[in-house]
Amino acid sequence: MSRRGTAEKKTAKYDPIYRNRLVNMLVNRILKHGKKSLAYQIIYRAVKKIQQKTETNPLSVLRQAIRGVTPDITVKARRVGGSTHQVPVEIGSTQGKALAVRWLLAASRKRPGRDMAFKLSSELVDAAKGSGDAIRKKEETHRMAEANRAFAHFR
């Protein structure tokens, strides 16, 4: 065990235009090969497309989408007596948001089409409405946790 103290949590930074932490989380997750300016371009174009589609505040749509996709509980594999059980575990808000962002980006990458900004904006609008692949992933995770509720005492 480490003799040092626990490391303090890093506070998430804000993005330069919207001053929003969620936008920055999206930018950092969509980032590939260190091309952060390209990641910002994609996100900002997606936000503009959301504005055009819904004619409402795009950041509220983003917040609603992430709130809809954020899981309360997940399953972790745990070995007990030679067999592996899926043990349901509650997760914190920060970890839940990180999972939600990851699932939203994975779902938008799976969508047909070439333009990532368009795919991301479509997925975010769908998630805000309560449909889409990312919402399905959250429901599937919750179903798995419910099905394995008997193993909750292995925590």
Curated annotation (Swiss-Prot):
A single Gene Ontology CC term: plastid
Keyword Ribosomal protein: yes
Matches recorded under InterPro entries: Ribosomal_uS7 (IPR000235), Ribosomal_uS7_bac/org-type (IPR005717), Ribosomal_uS7_CS (IPR020606), Ribosomal_uS7_dom (IPR023798), Ribosomal_uS7_dom_sf (IPR036823)
Molecular function (Gene Ontology), one example: rRNA binding
Principal cellular location given in the protein's record: plastid
GO BP field: translation
Annotated compartments: Plastid
Keywords: Plastid, Ribonucleoprotein, Ribosomal protein, RNA-binding, rRNA-binding
Biological role stated in the UniProt entry: One of the primary rRNA binding proteins, it binds directly to 16S rRNA where it nucleates assembly of the head domain of the 30S subunit.
Assembly mode: Part of the 30S ribosomal subunit.
Protein family per UniProt: Belongs to the universal ribosomal protein uS7 family.
Protein name: Small ribosomal subunit protein uS7cz/uS7cy
